[in-house]
Amino acid sequence: MNSLLITGTDTGAGKTIVTSALAAYWHKYYPSQRLGVIKLLQTGIGDHEHYQAMFAGQESVEVVCPLRFTTPVAPPIAAERENQPIPLEIVWKSLVSLQKSCDFVLAEGLGGLGSPVTWELTVADLAGEWRLPTVLVVPVKLGAIAQAVANVALARQTQVNLKGIILSCSHPLSPQELSDWAPMDLIQSLTGVPVLGVIPYLETIKDLDQLAKSASHLDLEPLISLDCRTQFLG
C-alpha cells in the first residue's frame, strides 16, 4: 500500500514534526512524484493549516483534511458539543482518493494511538481495520520507554501493521539525555519493533531543507514498499 500513518504515544508526541520531515524529504528528493498529505481528522486549528502553508503553490503535493471540528478537544466530545456526527466513511473515501491520485500518502493521525476517534473506536482501531502501515512517534523524555512499550502492546492488540518507531526531540537534548531517556537498543529489545532513528529538536518546522535533512538520517526503507521505492527511483 502506498501510504503511511504517522501516530504517536500522545498528543504533542511530535507527529506533525515527523510528518513534516518525511513530507519535506520526499518533496526534495522525489519532486516528480505526487505526494499526498492528509490529516485524517482535526479538532481546532493547527496541523492542516501548517501543511497548507508548508506546501503552498506546490502542484506535486496535495494536502487534505476531510473532517474537522472547531472545538479543540477529543473528536467524540467535540462532535457532541457541536451536535455533529463523525462520518468516518468520508475520511476513508478521502484517503482512498489520495492513494489513487498520488504516488505516496502520508496520513497524520490525531492525538495518540489510544486516542478516541468515536465513542467506540480509537486511532489504533482505525489503523488496524484500515490496514495502514504505521510508524509510532515517541517523544524523548523521562518515561519514553514505558510509553513505547505500552503503545506497541496496544498496536499488537489491535493488529496494527507497525513498521517502526521514530524518536522525536521537542527541546534541545544532550547525547547523554537521549541515551538515558530513550535508549534505542532497550526500546527495540522490549518492543520487538525497530527504532528507525531520531528527529532532533528543530527551532522551526517551516524550513523545508532543514526538515528534509533531519529525515535523511532515519532508516526510511521499512516505511515504503519495494514497489514505491522502485517507482521513486525509476
Curated annotation (Swiss-Prot):
GO:BP terms for this protein? biotin biosynthetic process
UniProt entry tagged with the keyword Metal-binding: yes
Give the residues the record marks as binding Mg(2+): 16, 47, 108
Q: Which residues bind substrate?
A: 43
Annotated EC: 6.3.3.3
Catalysed reaction(s) here are:
(7R,8S)-7,8-diammoniononanoate + CO2 + ATP = (4R,5S)-dethiobiotin + ADP + phosphate + 3 H(+); (7R,8S)-8-amino-7-(carboxyamino)nonanoate + ATP = (4R,5S)-dethiobiotin + ADP + phosphate + H(+)
**Where would you find this protein in the cell?**
Cytoplasm
> Per its UniProt record, what HAMAP family does this chain match?
BioD (MF_00336)
Described function: Catalyzes a mechanistically unusual reaction, the ATP-dependent insertion of CO2 between the N7 and N8 nitrogen atoms of 7,8-diaminopelargonic acid (DAPA, also called 7,8-diammoniononanoate) to form a ureido ring. This cyanobacterium does not encode bioA (which catalyzes the formation of the precursor for this reaction in the cannonical pathway), instead it encodes bioU, which replaces bioA and also performs the first half of the cannonical BioD reaction. Thus in this organism BioD has a different substrate.
| Name of the featured protein | ATP-dependent dethiobiotin synthetase BioD
Look up and give the organism this protein is from: Rippkaea orientalis (strain PCC 8801 / RF-1) (Cyanothece sp. (strain PCC 8801))
The gene for this chain is: bioD
